[in-house]
A protein has these predicted regions:
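Peripheral, non-transmembrane regulatory/ligand-interaction domains of membrane transport proteins
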Residues: 1-201
Length: 201
């Protein structure tokens, strides 16, 4: 039997997070040495799901203020960032959640190797999802930030959301994440990522 092909997603240029590209909304990026500006890609899509022990709420985020309010009101907040080539959105996430420049660069680097790293008050987990595309095995980057009462996922734009099953479980109350906290949500997202390997093995 012929072996299946394996390939990764296409390589992107790393998003420039320098302050020269600061948006009109006033989100200042972290300082860099002599960064060269690159054109931004399509705007990233930010989906927020917040929950407690009894209910949950979902929305598409348009402003930083929405993230700040959600963090104050809900015990567990998950922000899924779909799109790695939108430096304005990346800077906004860094400002709201106090994510450093090096960690942000890791989050939006498509070829980042899987790893776990602690950045002060946050844990960064770089991983890869696996799927079939025809006869080829395709791996897509996903980066998770675990912080105090929140999880952030950065991932490529994909036709199929690898975490939709997690959303459904939270919507229908089939998890105890609202009681158990953001670390339980992070563990569930990693479980789903790893489970995706079994059909390929």
């Amino acid at each position: 039997m012929a072996s299946r092909k394996h390939r990764r997603r296409r390589r992107h240029r790393r998003a420039d997070l320098s302050p020269e590209l600061t948006s009109e909304a006033g989100f200042s990026g972290p300082e860099t040495g002599s960064a060269t500006a690159v054109s931004a890609g399509s705007p990233a899509v930010l989906r927020m799901l917040a929950c407690d022990g009894q209910s949950c709420a979902e929305t598409t985020v348009l402003r930083a203020e929405e993230l700040t309010v959600a963090r104050e009101q809900w015990p567990v907040v998950w922000i899924d960032v779909e799109g790695l080539d939108d430096p304005e959105t990346t800077r906004m996430m860094g400002t709201v959640f106090d994510i450093g420049e090096l960690a942000l660069e890791d989050a939006v680097t498509p070829d980042e190797r899987p790893k776990v790293e602690i950045f002060g008050h946050q844990v960064l987990i770089a991983a890869r999802t696996v799927r079939y595309e025809g006869d080829a095995v395709v791996t897509d980057p996903v980066c998770l930030f675990l912080g105090d009462r929140y999880v952030i996922t950065f991932r490529e734009r994909q036709a199929r959301d690898p975490f939709e099953g997690v959303r459904r479980r939270i919507r229908h109350g089939r998890t105890r994440i609202g009681h158990e906290g953001a670390d339980a949500l992070c563990a569930l997202l990693l479980d789903v990522t790893i489970d995706g390997y079994f059909p390929v093995l």
